[in-house]
Amino acid sequence: MLTFIIGLVILIGGAALYGRFCEKVFGPDDRKTPAYTKEDGVDFVPMKGWKNSLINLLNIAGTGPILGPIQGILFGPIAFLTIPIGNVIGGAMHDYFSGMICLRDGGTQMPEMIRRYSTKGIYKFYNVFVCVLLLLVGAVFIYTPGDIAATQLFGFDGKATSVSTWVIYGVIFLYYLIATVFPIDAIIGKIYPIFGGILLFSAIGIFIGIFVTGMPLMNIWDSWAAPVLSLTGADGTVGTFTYADYFSTKHFLPIFFVTVACGILSGFHSTQTAIISRTMKSERQGRNTFYNMMVLEGFIAMVWAAGAMGVYNLALQEPNAGLATGTVGVVCKYLLGHVGGIIALLGVIVLPITSGDTALRALRLSLSETLHIDQSTNGKRIKLAVPIFALVIAILVFAKTNADGFNILWRYFAWANQTLSLFAFLCITAWMFENGKGKWAWIPMIPGCFYTFICVTYIANAHIGFNIPWTPAYIIGVACAVAYVVACCMYGKKRAAKLLAK
């Protein structure tokens, strides 16, 4: 339990110190924001600070900070330290600078930010990559809340052959269409406070439940070799699960960081902070809206990691049995009882839905900005949304009807999500050099270098990637990480030199 508490102190204390430091480096001021200078009643709409913060939290927090930590905690209590450290210096910093640069540049979406602060080749590649990721996000965030609702809320079997499964998908899909097309304040701004209440109840309820029930949480200095429980394999053999075995055999680097994903860092978040940059009344709201909301997502990840470890150690749920979604229900009902568990499950369902809707909205905005498509009327917005939703349906059908479809979808989603952050780190570095802040370029380059290693090593070894053995995969990862830092420095200094020449 003490390691968990230390992790929370690192998260909260680190955020207070490093968040203020990042704010000082950026230098927010009192200039008029795009919400006023470009107000259109649809996407550029001034909204209150608390509402922007809540909407951003719900936008960025999907199933990642729940399902990721539930699987990531299998590596042991080291997760209680790596999640907060990575969140503070990586994820929250990424969200803050991405959102603030978009805000400072007139409420631009991420493709435009990439165009301004990188090369034409990177810009073109990013446009394709981000569109694919947002489609994957839309599909994943229909699939996961739909299945949790079907199996754990309504008691259906959740199979592809069941009409109930597709009816639930259809309801979520219809909401996504409405939220993608209509004015942000009319739909998202009105319903999100309700969703936020459910989310906060579930997260805080589980957090309190961990202490009230005295869940057995392992410390980093405890013996990781103690058997947690007996497992019966598919072949009938009986074995034991230990955190030590999992840590030593499952390649903590890079698997842990790709698995936990959103609780530490998510490239997807930059597409969401760009949306909120259009509704903020003041630049000075940025730290709370962007940085602190990512820290709050880190708190959610910590809570679910602890809840999962508790039920594993109590042998209430087998770590390797079934989907991580099964552990969600066990944690909720054990800690909060039947009624509280249902409300907590609603919170788990709300999280991905409130990310999926704005993911598809971000895709529409990005396409319209990149291709210069007029979005002034509902009809024109629907016209662009139709092909987007057709592709999401196709991905969803594949994931649901193929035996290994969702596993393939989730792996590509998780890897692409982390990889997308590398584009933002590059542009943040370039922005710093261009704005006379080159001495602070290490802020984005450290996590950028680390995640280049993580993402390249993972895809080099993965069966869904190049299927290269681990040793050469690690070598390739290190080489690419070094090359990333060199490229960032050279490109940043080149931009700074051009600026001085002018």
What is each residue range found by the language model?
Residues 10-11, 15, 90-106, 110-180, ...:
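Helix-loop-helix module between adjacent transmembrane segments
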Residues 7-17, 130, 134-138, 196-214, ...:
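Selective recognition of specific alpha-helical transmembrane segments in multi-pass small-molecule
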Residues 123-127, 162-170, 292-302, 308-319, ...:
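Loop-to-transmembrane helix boundary motifs in multi-pass membrane proteins
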Residues 138-156, 164-167, 179-180, 199-241, ...:
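Hydrophobic alpha-helical segments and their helix-loop junctions in multi-pass secondary transporters
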Residues 5, 9-27, 129, 145-149, ...:
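Membrane-interface loop-to-helix entry segments
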Residues 99, 210-240, 284, 292-330, ...:
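Extracellular/periplasmic helix-exit of transmembrane alpha-helices
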Residues 1-19, 72-102, 111, 341, ...:
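Extracellular loop-to-transmembrane helix junctions
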Residues 10-66, 282-285:
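Membrane-interface "cap" regions at the ends of multi-pass membrane proteins
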